[in-house]
């Protein structure tokens, strides 16, 4: 997985596939792609600074006035030997998606499961890149103290964009920003994208997608409130990250994994046998050392900021080497996969620039 990307054989593609890329449904989806992403990004950038002004005041109020039973239920999980909590159903959903994803690549997989393979790959990539990769990397490099540490243990308060007092050697869950519980709940939004863009133009499917999306956002807000009640997170850790996390999910669906293009390819090649097995996992595996390299770079500059361990500045060099080594390999593998999907290497090279 982490070696140089192999050369993939170019398959024969049904000519109707290229014509389908210019069909009206695909053009409509592409037309609203960039504005949708911009709306999410701009809204997220606006909401975070606005919420920042009320971060401490509202978190204190929720902790004092809110239902502590709600806070306990939102935070606990049966995976830590406790009673089931609010985050358990999304975690079980992600685990089931992983199992079905591996099953969909089996030679005995049914056609129905094979048709779901692009969607399962999207869910798996979202879980690895968003709920795990982005969330925990930010926790480790930001190191923000949680409310109960600031109020009861005299840890210094820091804003969401500032380096906090925690370091990764204190534990992988010590950082407050962003909220992993909220990110897990928001991963259920993948189903809305699947139902809305799954190739069915039925109003019922799209109404279901919109309704489910509203429910997921409400559940995520409730999770953020519950985590503030239990003094485990500031509001900016959870509510402030809804739109940025949603933007990452949107980016994965349309820009990076290009699900509409994959669905058109699926119609022309129903078995999907031309694609490398578990290619989404391999892609995530190549992105992991790049993410680690970026973290090393930030850790290095963070050591200069605190001036306690200046020798950690050497991590910048390690990070640069990791990014420099794995970035071209990741890009090469990604391009080769979509050369197969598009069936035209020159076209894919133009589209990925």
Residue ranges and their predicted role:
Residues 42, 125-130, 134, 188, ...:
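Hydrophobic faces of alpha-helical transmembrane segments in multi-pass integral membrane proteins
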Residues 62, 105-110, 141-146, 150, ...:
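Membrane-interfacial segments
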Residues 161-314, 319, 325-332:
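Membrane-embedded catalytic cores of phosphoryl/pyrophosphoryl-handling enzymes
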Residues 85-101, 181-192:
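Hydrophobic alpha-helical transmembrane segments
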Residues 7-30, 107-117, 201-207, 260-281, ...:
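Membrane-interfacial, low-structure loops and terminal tails that flank and connect transmembrane helices
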Residues 37-44, 121-130, 287-289, 313-322:
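Hydrophobic alpha-helical membrane-interfacial segments at the cytosolic entry of transmembrane helices
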Residues 103-140, 206-213:
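Interfacial segments of alpha-helical transmembrane regions
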Residues 18-98, 139-146, 154-157, 168-169, ...:
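N-terminal transmembrane-helix/juxtamembrane module of multi-pass inner/ER membrane proteins
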């Amino acid at each position: 997985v982490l070696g140089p990307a192999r050369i993939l054989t170019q398959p024969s593609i049904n000519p109707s596939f290229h014509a389908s890329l210019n069909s009206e449904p695909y053009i409509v989806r592409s037309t609203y792609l960039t504005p949708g992403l911009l709306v999410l990004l701009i809204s997220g950038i606006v909401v975070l600074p606005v919420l920042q002004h009320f971060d401490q005041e509202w978190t204190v109020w929720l902790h004092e006035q809110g239902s502590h039973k709600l806070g306990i239920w939102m935070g606990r999980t049966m995976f830590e030997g406790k009673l089931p909590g609010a985050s358990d159903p999304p975690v079980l959903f992600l685990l089931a998606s992983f199992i079905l994803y591996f099953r969909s690549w089996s030679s005995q997989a049914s056609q129905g499961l094979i048709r779901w393979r692009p969607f399962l790959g999207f869910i798996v990539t979202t879980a690895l890149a968003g709920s795990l990769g982005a969330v925990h990397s930010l926790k480790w490099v930001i190191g923000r103290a949680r409310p109960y540490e600031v109020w009861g243990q005299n840890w210094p308060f820091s804003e969401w964009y500032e380096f906090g007092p925690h370091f990764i050697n204190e534990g992988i869950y010590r950082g407050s920003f962003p909220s992993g519980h909220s990110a897990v709940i928001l991963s259920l939004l993948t189903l809305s994208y699947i139902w809305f863009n799954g190739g069915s133009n039925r109003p019922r499917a799209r109404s279901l997608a919109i309704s489910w999306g509203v429910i997921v956002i409400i559940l995520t807000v409730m999770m953020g409130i519950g985590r503030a009640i239990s003094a485990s997170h500031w509001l900016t850790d959870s509510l402030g990250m809804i739109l940025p996390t949603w933007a990452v999910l949107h980016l994965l669906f349309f820009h990076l994994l290009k699900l509409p293009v994959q669905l058109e390819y699926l119609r022309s090649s129903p078995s999907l046998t031309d694609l490398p097995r578990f290619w989404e996992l391999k892609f995530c595996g190549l992105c992991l050392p790049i993410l680690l390299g970026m973290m090393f770079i930030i850790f290095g500059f963070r050591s200069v900021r605190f001036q306690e361990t200046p020798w950690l500045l050497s991590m910048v060099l390690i990070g640069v080497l990791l990014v420099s080594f794995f970035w071209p390999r990741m890009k090469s593998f990604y391009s080769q996969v979509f050369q197969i999907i598009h069936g035209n290497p020159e076209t894919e090279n133009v589209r990925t620039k």
